[in-house]
């Protein structure tokens, strides 16, 4: 009987520790995790030669975005994979930037370069989808781009492709910015189809906001 009681108390203690860990995990991630899209693009094991031998660690390239125009890239390094991913997520959130969108696509064609990576992005009509490779697709989906044509013209290395895609997105400009710089009406610098798509997307967003507040 004593052994059974001891075993039962040990199980209770283990269960208690597990519950405390679960609560800690929820408290650590909180609601932030549910509000963002996270994509792990690559995980690599690296080694460092020291006096006593080799020390191994892991690196993780992570993309984080809200699916509504905000996206960031992070690179984490740690002795364990989960810790490396967590560091990558934290860095990605610090590197957030806004991507100008017209409806579900980008504002104009653009090409970005980073190291040996070269990525070309072109707007696409609704229903086209994200036509892109794995690394570029992760960035575009996290940014909230649903219709786009992307092509890698340089290195196929995932890190280079990701940074080239980010460089291309950072080159995007809103029609208002171009019109103000040239001193022209917005109708003279943006196609009528683009302006129509933007009005429709703004109307849909306003309708969704009204339904949410009702």
UniProtKB/Swiss-Prot annotation:
Originating species: Mycolicibacterium smegmatis (strain ATCC 700084 / mc(2)155) (Mycobacterium smegmatis)
Family recorded in the similarity comment: Belongs to the universal ribosomal protein uS5 family.
Region (Disordered), start-end ranges: 1-34
GO BP term, pick one: translation
Gene3D superfamilies: 3.30.160.20, 3.30.230.10
Residues of the S5 DRBM domain: 36-99
Designated name of the protein: Small ribosomal subunit protein uS5
Subunit structure: Part of the 30S ribosomal subunit. Contacts proteins S4 and S8.
InterPro entries attached to this UniProt entry: Ribosomal_Su5_D2-typ_SF, Ribosomal_uS5, Ribosomal_uS5_bac-type, Ribosomal_uS5_C, Ribosomal_uS5_N, Ribosomal_uS5_N_CS, Ribsml_uS5_D2-typ_fold_subgr
PANTHER family in UniProt: MITOCHONDRIAL RIBOSOMAL PROTEIN S5
Functional note: With S4 and S12 plays an important role in translational accuracy.
Keyword presence, Ribonucleoprotein: yes
Keywords: Ribonucleoprotein, Ribosomal protein, RNA-binding, rRNA-binding
Pfam families: Ribosomal_S5 (PF00333), Ribosomal_S5_C (PF03719)
Any GO MF annotation of the entry: rRNA binding
Record remark on domains: The N-terminal domain interacts with the head of the 30S subunit; the C-terminal domain interacts with the body and contacts protein S4. The interaction surface between S4 and S5 is involved in control of translational fidelity.
One Gene Ontology cellular component: small ribosomal subunit
Compositional bias ranges of the Basic and acidic residues kind: 14-34
């Amino acid at each position: 009987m004593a052994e059974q009681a001891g075993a039962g108390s040990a199980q209770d203690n283990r269960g208690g520790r597990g519950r405390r860990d679960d609560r800690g995990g929820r408290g650590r991630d909180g609601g932030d995790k549910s509000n963002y899209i996270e994509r792990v693009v690559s995980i690599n094991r690296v080694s460092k030669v020291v006096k006593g031998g080799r020390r191994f660690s892991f690196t993780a390239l992570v993309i984080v975005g809200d699916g509504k125009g905000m996206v960031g890239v992070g690179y984490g390094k740690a002795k364990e994979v989960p810790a490396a991913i967590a560091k990558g997520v934290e860095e990605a959130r610090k590197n957030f930037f806004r991507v100008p969108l017209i409806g579900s696509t980008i504002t104009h064609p653009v090409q970005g370069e980073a190291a040996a990576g070269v990525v070309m992005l072109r707007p696409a009509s609704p229903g086209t989808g994200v036509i892109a490779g794995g690394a570029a697709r992760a960035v575009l989906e996290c940014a909230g781009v649903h219709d786009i044509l992307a092509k890698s013209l340089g290195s196929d290395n995932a890190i280079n492709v990701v940074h080239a895609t980010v460089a291309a997105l950072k080159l995007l400009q809103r029609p208002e910015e171009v019109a103000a710089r040239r001193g022209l009406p917005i109708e003279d610098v943006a196609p009528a189809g683009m302006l129509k798509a933007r009005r429709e997307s703004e109307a849909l967003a306003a309708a969704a906001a009204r339904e949410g507040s009702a």
